């Protein structure tokens, strides 16, 4: 050590360089040792090119691996192509079908709900969004067949992305709840619109019934023209404005001659005194007007007819009255009589003068009535019900505000009306699941309506409160194993109906829709016109007679209409036992015979006890039989009114003829 110290003291630079060299050699040795003893990584984190998800893969497969999220292969060359051939790109049998139904090996996971305001779970909501996006990005193979191809593609997506059973039950329950609210809203809207129409009609009629002043003036002018014609007919060729003129006799000849002459003399003196009060030029004008009118009677009749027609046109359709039309007809008849007299100047018959005088008198009377009665009668109109569709019949609307049913207010926001808050259905699972379904008796009102309104299919005699208008409108449910009750069946049990059938639902029928609304059948109109029913001559036995006891079958009996109007369609299931099928056939035949006998007995009993007329509803619009129809139903009200008008005209004609003969 002493020698080394002496050497370093004699050469300090060499000692420093030697120390640095030793340190460098030691560091290099350590680095080489670490490189030699380095352990290669077993896994590495890679990023998917397609879905951008990070995945941990073995280190050797960092450029050839399948993404577990999108199932796409990631292995590329420098030019961007795949680094190996992929047969699944061009071989169909190597691809598996993509479906939203979870595989059986996946563990059952609890439902994840987005929020309390969304009916669908997170998975079903994502599937709905996917369907919408795929439909939006759809490109047809042929542009001319776009509609057909997109319908097929939509059906394919519906089959691929089906809703889970809880979501399907929730959607059906929500649709039912929404239909109830919208039905009540529509009913309230129709009732308020009817009240508004009635109020508007009353205000409009009160303002429009009063005739305008021009119409009243024209009616008065027509009456004055007819009165002038009547006076010219009474005076004849004489002139009342001459100094020695007298009034026509007011009493018929053959009575007390002295009293009649005294009365005529007093009237002539009074008329002369009245003419003396008028100035001379006024008397001359009256004389000229009288002479002109007496020589132009046909023109005055034409002017009166035109005046009546103009008054009717100015009055309009609302103010048109029967008396105006009758007055116009009388003016037309009077014009025809004057024209006939004008063309028969050589030999004018005596009956023509009598008929002309009678018509003029009647026209004067009718014209005076039309001129005085300036307001149309505003009596209460008889309500004419209208036919409403989509389930809201006119008989549902109350006829008075006191009978109105309280409905939700329409003044609220549109979102709360047409998108109501979905009711909670998960707490309902605590209630009793299995309830005994109600069996409707064939003798009850739904059974009778189902038997009368059947169109050839078997109607279920239970309520189908599933939110659909017809029982066949709901989609067919999937077959479930025995002992398994779905959530949709549970909601159908809560609404007092049968569980969803494992078989496809039948076609929509009117009878099932009638049976679905059995609680309000007395206040609804049928959904189909009676002219289109096919009842094959059966009587519509909706209500039993007072002395008839309701026939309620046992729980093992099923309803079957008689006379073969309906046929039983048994579901086509696999045959298990021939003896069981034979026994079932015998039971069905016995039920058919028993129900037929019961129906014929009820029909015969009702025919004996009922004294009212029965109406047979057929496939055509024939009413009741002619033997039971009263005579008042055959005679229309218009015919009765016409007979009354003819009787009034004949009476007035004979009265005018009598007056004319008496005055002459």
Swiss-Prot record:
Where, in residue ranges, is this chain on the Nuclear side?
1-214, 319-322, 375-642
Pfam family name, one: Ima1_N
Q: Per the record, what phenotype accompanies loss of this gene's function?
A: Knockout mice show significant defects in angiogenesis, characterized by reduced extension of the superficial vascular plexus in the retina and defective aortic ring sprouting.
Q: Per UniProt, which keywords does this protein have?
A: Acetylation, Angiogenesis, Membrane, Nucleus, Phosphoprotein, Transmembrane, Transmembrane helix
Name it: Transmembrane protein 201
This entry carries the following GO cellular component terms, namely: nuclear inner membrane; nuclear membrane
Q: Which residues carry this modification: N-acetylmethionine?
A: 1
> Locations of Low complexity compositional bias?
245-261, 508-520
The segments annotated as topological domain Perinuclear space are 236-297, 344-356, 664
- Its source organism is Mus musculus (Mouse)
Alphabetical GO biological process terms = angiogenesis; fibroblast migration; nuclear migration; positive regulation of endothelial cell migration
Q: How does it assemble?
A: Isoform 2 interacts with EMD. Isoform 3 interacts with SUN2 and LMNA. May bind to Ran GTPase; has a greater affinity for Ran-GTP over Ran-GDP.
Compositionally biased residues, Basic and acidic residues: 578-587, 595-608
> Is the keyword Transmembrane assigned to this protein?
yes
**Which residues are annotated as modified residue Phosphoserine in the UniProt record?**
441, 444, 450, 454, 466, 477, 480, 529
Q: Does the keyword Lipoprotein apply?
A: no
The family annotation for this protein states:
Belongs to the TMEM201 family.
Gene Ontology MF term list: actin filament binding; lamin binding
């Amino acid at each position: 050590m002493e020698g080394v110290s002496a050497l370093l003291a004699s050469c300090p630079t060499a000692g420093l360089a030697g120390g640095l060299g030793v340190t460098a050699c030691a560091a290099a040795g350590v680095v080489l040792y670490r490189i030699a003893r380095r352990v290669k990584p077993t896994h590495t984190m890679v990023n998917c090119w397609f879905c951008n998800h990070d995945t941990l893969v073995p280190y050797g497969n960092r450029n050839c691996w399948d993404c577990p999220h999108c199932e796409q292969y990631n292995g590329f060359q420098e030019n961007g192509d795949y680094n190996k051939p992929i047969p699944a790109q061009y071989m169909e049998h190597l691809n598996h079908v993509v479906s939203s139904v979870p595989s059986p090996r996946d563990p059952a996971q609890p439902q994840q709900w987005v929020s309390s305001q969304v009916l669908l779970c997170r998975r079903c909501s994502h599937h709905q969004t996917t369907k919408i996006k795929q439909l939006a990005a759809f490109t047809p193979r042929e542009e001319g067949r776009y509609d057909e191809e997109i319908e097929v593609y939509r059906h394919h997506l519906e089959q691929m992305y089906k809703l889970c059973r809880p979501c399907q039950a929730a959607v059906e329950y929500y649709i039912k709840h929404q239909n109830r609210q919208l039905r009540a809203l529509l009913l309230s809207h129709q009732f308020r619109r009817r009240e508004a129409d009635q109020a508007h009609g009353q205000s409009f009629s009160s303002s429009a019934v009063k005739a305008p002043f021009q119409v009243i003036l024209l009616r008065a002018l027509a009456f004055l023209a007819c009165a002038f014609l009547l006076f010219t007919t009474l005076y004849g060729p004489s002139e009342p404005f001459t100094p020695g003129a007298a009034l026509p006799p007011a009493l018929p000849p053959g009575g007390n001659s002295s009293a009649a002459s005294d009365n005529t003399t007093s009237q002539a003196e009074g008329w002369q005194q009245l003419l003396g009060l008028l100035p001379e030029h006024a008397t001359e004008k009256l004389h000229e007007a009288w002479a002109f009118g007496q020589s132009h009677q046909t023109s005055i009749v034409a002017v009166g007819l035109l005046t009546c027609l103009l008054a009717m046109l100015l009055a309009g359709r609302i103010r048109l009255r029967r008396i105006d039309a009758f007055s116009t007809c009388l003016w037309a008849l009077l014009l025809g009589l004057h024209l006939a007299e004008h063309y028969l100047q050589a030999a004018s018959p005596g009956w023509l003068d009598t008929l002309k005088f009678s018509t003029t008198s009647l026209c004067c009377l009718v014209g005076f009535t039309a001129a005085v009665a300036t307001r149309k009668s505003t009596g209460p109109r008889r309500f004419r019900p209208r036919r409403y569709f989509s389930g809201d019949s006119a008989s549902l609307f109350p006829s008075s505000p006191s009978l109105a049913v309280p409905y939700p207010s329409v003044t609220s926001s549109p979102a709360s009306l047409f998108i109501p808050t979905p009711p909670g259905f998960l707490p309902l699972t605590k209630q009793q699941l299995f309830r005994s379904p109600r069996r409707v008796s064939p003798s009850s009102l739904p059974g009778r309506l189902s038997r009368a309104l059947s169109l050839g299919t078997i109607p279920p005699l239970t309520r189908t409160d599933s939110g659909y208008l017809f029982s066949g409108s709901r989609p067919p449910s999937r077959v479930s194993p025995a002992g398994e009750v779905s959530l949709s069946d549970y909601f159908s049990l809560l609404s007092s109906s049968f569980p969803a059938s494992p078989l496809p639902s039948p076609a929509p029928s009117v009878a099932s829709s009638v049976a679905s609304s059995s609680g309000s059948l007395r206040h609804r109109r049928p959904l189909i016109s009676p002219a289109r029913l096919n009842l094959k001559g059966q009587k519509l036995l909706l209500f039993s007679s007072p002395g008839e006891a309701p026939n309620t079958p046992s729980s093992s009996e099923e309803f079957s209409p008689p006379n073969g109007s309906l046929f039983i369609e048994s579901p086509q299931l696999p045959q298990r036992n021939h003896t069981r099928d034979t026994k079932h056939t015998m039971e069905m035949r016995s039920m058919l015979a028993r129900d037929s006998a019961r129906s014929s007995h009820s029909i015969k009993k009702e025919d004996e006890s009922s004294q009212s007329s029965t109406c047979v509803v057929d496939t055509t619009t024939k009413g009741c039989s002619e033997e039971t129809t009263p005579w008042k139903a055959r005679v229309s009200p218009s015919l009765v009114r016409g007979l009354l008008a003819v009787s009034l005209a004949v009476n007035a004609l004979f009265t005018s003829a009598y007056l004319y003969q008496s005055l002459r």
